[in-house]
């Protein structure tokens, strides 16, 4: 009789502990989801602002007399339009939700990879800009020379700015994922008729 009562108490205790762990996990997921959403929003606001500045600077191409500057500002304006197309949908899209920390951690890892790939492309853009400016030196035609210099400068400026942006977003997403992963180490309880067993989940 006493053993049965003890077993019942174990089951009740186990149920209460599991419920408490699930409640804590739900609260953590909500908090970290909000943090991820705010991080993404800040990033896209920055990208939208940078895009708007570059589009606005395109007007300088209409008033400058330097063909090199015309090419530089025109290319910047083109970059701005592309960045705007990327940033605006992300700002207005419905935020993602997650049912548990594992889903959130997986999505953060995927986001890290995207920013890491983008950072690699940024380095390529910078290299292309340097290459264009070097190529300009071999051109005899003045306008052609100025065109390559203008486009090259734009690629270097845009590539550098985006490299800092992507590197920052990569690092912030990684930092959040590490924090989420650390919390995934939970203590669960397994109840048998005679014993409690502790299981550490990583």
Language-model regions, residue ranges each:
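Helical transmembrane-bundle signal
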Residues: 51-61, 80-90, 125-132, 159-169
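Membrane-interface helix-boundary motifs at transmembrane edges
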Residues: 64-71, 142-144
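Loop-to-helix transition at the N-terminal end of transmembrane alpha-helices
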Residues: 67-83
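Alpha-helical transmembrane segments of polytopic membrane proteins
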Residues: 46-50, 75-80, 119, 155
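Juxtamembrane "helix-exit" motif on the non-cytosolic side of transmembrane helices
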Residues: 59-65, 138
